[in-house]
Amino acid sequence: MKIIFAGTPEFAAVALAALHAAGFEIPLVLTQPDRPAGRGMQLHASAVKQFALAHDIPVAQPVSLRLDGKYPEVAAEAHALLKATPHDVMVVAAYGLILPQSILDIPPRGCINIHASLLPRWRGAAPIHRAIESGDAETGVTIMQMELGLDTGPMLAMQRLPITADDTTASLHDKLATLGGEMIVQTLRRMEQGDLPAEPQPDGANYAAKILKEEATLDFTQPAEQLARKIRAFNPFPGAAATCDGTLIKFWHAQAVPASNQLPPGQVIAANPHDGVLVACGDGALRVTELQKPGGKRLSAVEFLKGFTLEDKRFQ
């Protein structure tokens, strides 16, 4: 079976690597254009492009696939390339570009998507973040047949994965990426054998909106449990944060703990090597165990307090 693969970040690169290791022929990879990154803002290839080039797989990087969009000539070239490349199916994982119907219609066996949630829950851009932030007990991966709607297509496979109390978006991402790679290989093997029934998604969809940097600010009037989930959900991006004496401090790890104090939300209850950093919340308190100030490294609470005083301070 010949596969065109479309994806961009590390999540997609794991799936591409799994397909390559399983022996599937991959005549073409689509990925987003190189983007400026790092302090020097130099152009960097996506994780998918890096894997493809390392394994001599041809790469195309159209800026758009919409014939009626801003770059119709680029889109037309991409359409022509797909039609000229012999393949059976397209596998899509976190590609980042909208696939119009004219693209979905090209692969003889359609387009199959790897989505990091238990559809129809958490359709959209940030399913891993939102699952942790909302306190879901589990998530998983859904393999679906793509159609024009956003993550609305019939399901071909689904596997569940528990969300542990210390999972961050980073750790859960890695687990789901590995699971997605395993599942797409299994799904395509079943497709080769002609055994791939599709199941319509049930009702009850909700949407995982894109993460905005503005969401990163912690509101200490909220319950500690809610804030602890947010800190885990926003690790590594964009990093939950609060301001103390005009300095923006990022919170990377924290646990909710009971607290009977009457201190105002955001007030530092304790900040010492024995107790760590304890911050009053609307309900309970946060025990913060890893912090970072601007331009600095992530530090344990003990190390952080050696260079920054929080005793009797209040976070805003």
UniProtKB/Swiss-Prot annotation:
Enzyme class per UniProt: transferase
Gene3D superfamilies, sorted: Formyl transferase, C-terminal domain, Formyl transferase, N-terminal domain
InterPro entries cross-referenced by the UniProt entry: Fmt (IPR005794), Formyl_trans_C (IPR005793), Formyl_trans_C_sf (IPR037022), Formyl_transf_N (IPR002376), Formyl_transf_N_sf (IPR036477), Formyl_transferase-like_C_sf (IPR011034), Met-tRNA-FMT_C (IPR044135), Met-tRNA-FMT_N (IPR041711)
Keyword Heme: no
This enzyme's EC code(s): 2.1.2.9
Pfam families for this protein: Formyl_trans_C, Formyl_trans_N
One term of GO molecular function: methionyl-tRNA formyltransferase activity
Recorded catalytic activity of this chain's protein: L-methionyl-tRNA(fMet) + (6R)-10-formyltetrahydrofolate = N-formyl-L-methionyl-tRNA(fMet) + (6S)-5,6,7,8-tetrahydrofolate + H(+)
Keyword field: Protein biosynthesis, Transferase
Keyword Metal-binding applies: no
GO cellular component, one term: cytosol
Positions of (6S)-5,6,7,8-tetrahydrofolate binding: S117, L118, L119, P120
Functional summary from the UniProt entry: Attaches a formyl group to the free amino group of methionyl-tRNA(fMet). The formyl group appears to play a dual role in the initiator identity of N-formylmethionyl-tRNA by promoting its recognition by IF2 and preventing the misappropriation of this tRNA by the elongation apparatus.
PANTHER family: METHIONYL-TRNA FORMYLTRANSFERASE, METHIONYL-TRNA FORMYLTRANSFERASE, MITOCHONDRIAL
Protein family per UniProt: Belongs to the Fmt family.
Protein name as annotated: Methionyl-tRNA formyltransferase
Originating organism: Janthinobacterium sp. (strain Marseille)
Gene that this sequence comes from: fmt
